[in-house]
Design a protein with these regions (language model features):
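Non-catalytic signal-transmission and effector/linker regions of two-component phosphorelay proteins
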Residues: 1-24, 30, 37, 151, ...
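Acidic catalytic/metal-coordinating carboxylates
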Residues: 51-52, 75-84
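Conserved acidic segment of CheY-like receiver
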Residues: 17-32, 36-40, 53, 68-71, ...
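Acidic, metal-coordinating helix/loop segments flanking the phosphotransfer/catalytic sites
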Residues: 49-67
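C-terminal output helix
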Residues: 103-105, 119, 123-132, 178, ...
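The feature encodes the CheY-like receiver
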Residues: 33, 75, 99, 103
Length: 223
């Protein structure tokens, strides 16, 4: 079962275009799915509801900023298994667990595996709205960071092997003259490699490029 809201114009308090504005709800309780969808859509949050894990996993779009409200106990594939499958794919989807039988070990496990929150059923509607809004904010940040990382990785992929060697040395703080000796090339060639690195990556300076890499969590090993 899937429930999808209609497209709505932007209103004050709703996510702007390009922001995270979708919540997946995965719970085998049909009525709970519907009630949560109505709650979220009452504040203009798009919702897609699923009553089984396979349907969700087939519909999940890893390139769309969203968050997931996930029941722990379901027939077949349970909530923790869904979380494991998402983690295995390096998904940046924030997960909010819900359970009618929650306990401390269960909530600790969920959070240790990357969930952003854990709510017990029946949950307070306002608390759920607050948690989901926070999850959508987190989703927007995570997807923006991933997009920036992919952009930097694509630019680095354009470098030749020798340009990569040069960049690794620069990242390590090695002076150009020492780079020339280590790589067995002339200082002029090192300067040419540095210039081509800037040109291919669109960076004003190598320092700016290295700064972008650090912000994206990329180091020498990823060059």
């Amino acid at each position: 079962m899937t429930v999808t809201s209609l497209s709505q114009p932007h209103r004050p308090g709703t996510p702007p275009a390009g922001a995270a504005d979708l919540v997946y709800v995965l719970d085998d309780d049909h009525e709970l799915c519907l009630s949560l969808a109505w709650l979220l859509e009452s504040v203009h949050i798009r919702t897609q509801c699923f009553t089984d894990a396979d349907a969700f996993l087939a519909a999940y779009d890893p390139d769309r900023p969203a968050c997931l409200v996930l029941d722990v106990r379901m027939p077949g594939t349970g909530g923790f298994r869904v979380q494991e499958l998402l983690n295995a794919e390096d998904a940046v989807l924030p997960v909010v667990f819900v359970s009618a039988h929650g306990d401390i070990p269960m909530s600790v496990r969920a959070l240790q595996q990357g969930a952003v929150d854990f709510l017990e059923k029946p949950y307070d509607p306002q608390r759920m709205l607050d948690v989901v809004q926070a999850g959508l904010h987190t989703a927007g940040e995570r997807y923006a960071r991933r997009a920036a990382r992919r952009t930097v990785e694509d630019r680095l992929a354009a470098l030749s092997p020798r340009e990569r060697d040069t960049l690794r040395q620069v990242i390590g703080g090695v002076p150009s003259r020492t780079i020339a000796k280590r790589l067995g090339i002339s200082l002029k060639t090192v300067d040419a490699h540095r210039a081509r690195i800037r040109e291919k990556t669109g960076a004003d300076t190598l320092g700016a490029l290295i700064g972008d890499m650090m912000r994206c969590g990329l180091d020498q090993s990823r060059v």
